[in-house]
Structures are given as structure tokens and as C-alpha cells.
């Protein structure tokens, strides 16, 4: 498929630069994946669209303050490092800028030597393997020296780090937030549970794929960067029980979707406890095996994320919805508004 089939016009002023004061006050577009019908709501209205017996699947990964600013020990030149994933011990796959200045053996110092990194090799797609040395606890030092790795299209400074974390973030390891979950408050999750909606938690650590645009004209030629996922057998049992009893599995975000679909693809359509690395790439023609609905933000033109959403709800339906979102001035991307996509999505409980 031609990548231009997933393009749309997006005025720059619709890219949300800061989160709203209250998470649940963002807008919600409800899209029926069968008919293409659209409703305009607020995120707190999601209560009306989820039924007793349904299950929300949430990614409880926690974002690291993964962006570090350091200097080369030999020249004092400024180097920016973005941690992507931990390999063995204190060795990490990273992105560095400017990459041409960081060769094998280069030593980078952060926080006046509180943290040091030595380049021990190259990684996929221009990355670098850095081995860190320090005294103390790595994540405590990272918390002190690091910055939240906001996407490049967000120019504003984030005053409160917690606004780039979900309220249920638990397992540290991501280089970006699973942004669909940013709309939920503890109170809203409690109301959903009181209604009989179940909550299930998985982990997928968001990595390089989030930062890499598709660089091929034919989307089939694009290769996703692998990301680590984990789902417990207890969670799998809960999800299978939901299915048996006629409930819907609603994933919160593309990361939860990729986790469940990876597991179902690798286990003959069944959900079971599993851990591993996924590079699954979903675009129109992909047959979904695990999920019945999806909550997600509005994504970049020509991105793998809009391709995933198009695979689930149909490219024409999705592009029509996106053009409607532009017309209605929805806020886009990480701090933007949300969509709920499902079959018969407009059929709310009376």
C-alpha cells in the first residue's frame, strides 16, 4: 500500500502543546467501525459506552526521565542521549545527538561526572550502545539528571512530570507515554469498576518505534522496532473469562493492542501469559484476533499508529473521522483528545 493513502492535512495549531488542567475533560470522538458514524463527546462520557462485563486493558508501563544532556570528556562537546531499552547489565540502546561525534570508546559525562557512559557499539537505525557507570542507584540518578522525553512536536516545557504518566503507571521502562491512558483519573476508573467494567493490566515498554517515521513509500517495506511486552497468566485468564461471558475486550492505546494481538498471533488466536519482544505491524488487511474496541489518541499523518487504527476501523472511516476532527478543532497527538472505536459504538446503556 502507498504511504500517501494515510496522509491528511493537519494545521500545526491543532497539535496540543500542554495537557489540559483536568485529564478527563479532553474531548472524545466515538467512531462506529462498522458504519463510520461519529459522535462528539467528552472523555468522561466513556462511562456511557462501556458495559457491565466489558474489560479495559491498560498498559502500566512507566516513562523514564530518559533524555540526558552530557558532554564528551575529551572535547567538552554537548551530547544529547535518549535511553531506549536496557540490554545486559548497565548497557542501554540509545539515540544520541549528534551521532557522528559518538564513536566506540567515546566517554560522555553527565551531571559533572555523577553519571558516565562509554560507547561500546552501534545499534539499529543509527543508535548507540552505551555502558553506564555510577555510584548509587541508577534510576535515582536518572530521576535527578534526566528529563521527560517529550516527542519532538511538543515545544513547550512540561511543568509537572506526572502529567506525562498515567495514574496507574507502575513498571518503569518506557521512552514515551502510552498516551491514550493519560485521560483516565483514579475516580473515573473507580466509576467504571462500580459499573461492572473490569480492568486488566499489561506492560509494553514504548521504545524506538514511537520516534521513527515510516521512510518507505510502500508500507509493507517498513520494519517496526521491537518492544518488550509482558502479560501474566492471571490477566490472560481474566480476558478469556470476559470473552466466554460475552463481554468486550477494549484496549487502551495502540501499545495494549499490539501486546494482545502479538500474543494471539503467536498462540493460534488464544490469549495466555507471555513475555517477549514484539515488532508486529498492523495495517489494513490485518485480521484482529483479540480485541473488540480501542481507545486511542489522534495520530500523526502517515504514521504506523494511524495505519493500526485504519486496520481496525477501515481506512476510509478513519480518514473521514480525522478530517472531521480537524474541522471540529480536536487537539492532536500526545496531549490531545481521544477516540473510542468499536462495532455498534453508539449503542449506549440506557
From Swiss-Prot:
GO terms for biological process: queuosine biosynthetic process; tRNA wobble guanine modification. It is found in: Cytoplasm. NCBIfam families: PRK00147.1, queA. Keywords: Cytoplasm, Queuosine biosynthesis, S-adenosyl-L-methionine, Transferase. This is S-adenosylmethionine:tRNA ribosyltransferase-isomerase. Its EC number is 2.4.99.17. Pathway: tRNA modification; tRNA-queuosine biosynthesis. It comes from the Bacteria. Monomer. InterPro entries: QueA (IPR003699), QueA_dom1 (IPR042118), QueA_dom2 (IPR042119), QueA_sf (IPR036100). Belongs to the QueA family. The gene is queA. Transfers and isomerizes the ribose moiety from AdoMet to the 7-aminomethyl group of 7-deazaguanine (preQ1-tRNA) to give epoxyqueuosine (oQ-tRNA). One of its GO terms (molecular function) is S-adenosylmethionine:tRNA ribosyltransferase-isomerase activity. It catalyses: 7-aminomethyl-7-carbaguanosine(34) in tRNA + S-adenosyl-L-methionine = epoxyqueuosine(34) in tRNA + adenine + L-methionine + 2 H(+). GO terms for cellular component: cytoplasm. Its main location: cytoplasm.
Amino acid at each position: 500500500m502507498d504511504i500517501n493513502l494515510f496522509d491528511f492535512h493537519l494545521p500545526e495549531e491543532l497539535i496540543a502543546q500542554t495537557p489540559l488542567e483536568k485529564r478527563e475533560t479532553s474531548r472524545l470522538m466515538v467512531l462506529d467501525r462498522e458504519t463510520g458514524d461519529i459522535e462528539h463527546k467528552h472523555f468522561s462520557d466513556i462511562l456511557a459506552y462501556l458495559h457491565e462485563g466489558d474489560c479495559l486493558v491498560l498498559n502500566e508501563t512507566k516513562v523514564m526521565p530518559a533524555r540526558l544532556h552530557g558532554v564528551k570528556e575529551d572535547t567538552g562537546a554537548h551530547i544529547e542521549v535518549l535511553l531506549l531499552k536496557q540490554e545486559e547489565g548497565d548497557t542501554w540502546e540509545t539515540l544520541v545527538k549528534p551521532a557522528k561525534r559518538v564513536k566506540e570508546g567515546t566517554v560522555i559525562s553527565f551531571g559533572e561526572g555523577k553519571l558516565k557512559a562509554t560507547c561500546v557499539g552501534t545499534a539499529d537505525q543509527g543508535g548507540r550502545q552505551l555502558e553506564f557507570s555510577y555510584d548509587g542507584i541508577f534510576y535515582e540518578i536518572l530521576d535527578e539528571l534526566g528529563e521527560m522525553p517529550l516527542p519532538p512536536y511538543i515545544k513547550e516545557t512540561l511543568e509537572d512530570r506526572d502529567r506525562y504518566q498515567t495514574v496507574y503507571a507502575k513498571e518503569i521502562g518506557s521512552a514515551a507515554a502510552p498516551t491514550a491512558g493519560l485521560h483516565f483519573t483514579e475516580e473515573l476508573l473507580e466509576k467504571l469498576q462500580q459499573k461492572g467494567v473490569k480492568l486488566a493490566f499489561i506492560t509494553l515498554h514504548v521504545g524506538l518505534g514511537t520516534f521513527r517515521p515510516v521512510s518507505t513509500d510502500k508500507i509493507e517495506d517498513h520494519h517496526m522496532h521491537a518492544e518488550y511486552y509482558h502479560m501474566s497468566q492471571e490477566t490472560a485468564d481474566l480476558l478469556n473469562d470476559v470473552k466466554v461471558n460475552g463481554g468486550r475486550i477494549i484496549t487502551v492505546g495502540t501499545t495494549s493492542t499490539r501486546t494482545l494481538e502479538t500474543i494471539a498471533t503467536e498462540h493460534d488466536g488464544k490469549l495466555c501469559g507471555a513475555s517477549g519482544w514484539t515488532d508486529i505491524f498492523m495495517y489494513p488487511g490485518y485480521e484482529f484476533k483479540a480485541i473488540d474496541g480501542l481507545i486511542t489518541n489522534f495520530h500523526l499523518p502517515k504514521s504506523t499508529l494511524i495505519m493500526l487504527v485504519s486496520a481496525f476501523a477501515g481506512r476510509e472511516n478513519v480518514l473521514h473521522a480525522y478530517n472531521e476532527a480537524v474541522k471540529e478543532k480536536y487537539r492532536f497527538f500526545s496531549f490531545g483528545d481521544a477516540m473510542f472505536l468499536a462495532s455498534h459504538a453508539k449503542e449506549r446503556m440506557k
